[in-house]
Amino acid sequence: MQINSHLSRLVYDVAAKYGDREALIYKNFSGKEWKSCSWNQFSGIVKQVSNAMLALGVNVQENLGVFSQNSVQYLFTDFGAWGIRAVTIPFYATSSEQQIQFMVNDAKIRFLFVGEQEQFDKARRVFTTCRSLERIIVFDSAVQLPEGDSTVMSFTDFLKLGEGLTRQAEVEQRQQDATMDDIANILYTSGTTGDSKGVILSMGQFHAAVEANHKDVPVDENDRVMNFLPFTHIFERGWALLCISVGARLIVNTYPQEVQKSMREQHPTCMSSVPRFWEKVYHGVQERIETSGAV
């Protein structure tokens, strides 16, 4: 386990211990087949993301937006950003154009990572109203990108900027300079009673949460962990960090409505959840009992 690792190096350190062992199980956006990658592959892509971000000129503690459903690209982006001491700001995948515009302008975001077509379309529609926004980077390879538009880029092309890890020395220098006071995330409130408020979370706060929960939550390298709640949710975010720290396999569920199907197919040993999910399960079982015939 790597409970004491700084977030900027967490995936590197876990990969050094578990190597080619399976780390992530996932489907591509709208994909049918489950895929997987090892800890070494996870670490390698995170390094590539960090190098690509440096190629774009991402600064220390610069804010980067992530507007997507759960995906492996989401994890690669988070850890790649932390690897160069940048800050990620997660947006809920269902955020409105007004919410996106407010958060991008409030946090002065230059680079916005988006999931699939719906998020891309919303981001494009507010682009001209976001003074700081320079580029949209799209996770889902199925999204149709306009030709000749330098303000949009596929995640595949983004990764090419990091090929060869030519800036890895700078990445490692930033990691040496990293502290627990560095900001890791800014999580915006729902804004139901007014404008959203950005809640600042430091590396040290996440480290303390992982350390405290590790003492009482019995999850380890043998577990298969389902990520069901959105990574935007602080509960799921902290849970994922704990599970990565101990080397557990993460099963990334992209679409919430598919979670029961994902559970049947992947047989997770544990997951974080909220009461509402189990209320739905209970009512579903009750409905089946009431509509089924007598035995």
Residue ranges and their predicted role:
Residues 10, 56, 83-161:
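Structural core segment of the AMP-binding/adenylate-forming
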Residues 19-22, 137-138, 153-156, 163-188, ...:
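Conserved pre-ATP/AMP-binding loop-to-beta segment of ANL
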Residues 24-79, 96-101, 154-163, 203-204:
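Conserved AMP-binding/adenylate-forming core of the ANL superfamily
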Residues 36-40, 184-210:
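Conserved AMP-binding A3 loop
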Residues 43-48, 180, 199-220, 228:
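Conserved structural elements of the adenylate-forming
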Residues 50, 62-63, 69-89, 93-97, ...:
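A short helix-loop-beta submotif of the ANL/AMP-binding
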Residues 51, 95-128, 209-226, 256-270:
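Conserved ATP-dependent adenylate/AMP-binding module captured primarily in the ANL superfamily
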Residues 207-224, 231-295:
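Conserved AMP-binding/adenylation subdomain of ANL enzymes
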